[in-house]
Amino acid sequence: MITLTINGKTRSVDAAPDTPLLWVLRDNLEMTGTKFGCGIAQCGACTVHIDGAATRSCITPVSAVAGKKITTIEAVGANTVGKAVQKAWLEVDVPQCGYCQSGQIMSAIALLAKNKNPSDADIDAAMSGNICRCGTYSQIRAAIHTAANMTRKEA
């Protein structure tokens, strides 16, 4: 058994140590918000936070995250930055098909947690590992700026 802290709750899972965190989340814990996209950490759909850092769960062995704080898309509304990103995503009407959105949102939150006033270049660099097949990159950038403005006003 491997003990994990996910979204503030302790969970024990029976999984091989080399099982990707993505599959533990989806299959063992039935947390399906984190998506499978490529399996090689190139698309960003599987992004979660490990101790606050955006991390690709498709290549992260579950044994590597025991004892660390894991945050998934299911818990993003629990903090100010997450709430602002969720609200901005809806205001700017970012999602089209929606498949990549959980990874996009997780990467955006990680950026805004470190940088409260990102430039376009900062956003592009932070989001460069996330692919949107629908091409909503300009809306994503606008939503991140909107969320940044919201969080600065609340500070």
Where on the chain are the PLM-derived regions?
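Signature of N-terminal electron-transfer/Fe-S-associated modules in redox systems
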Residues: 1-155
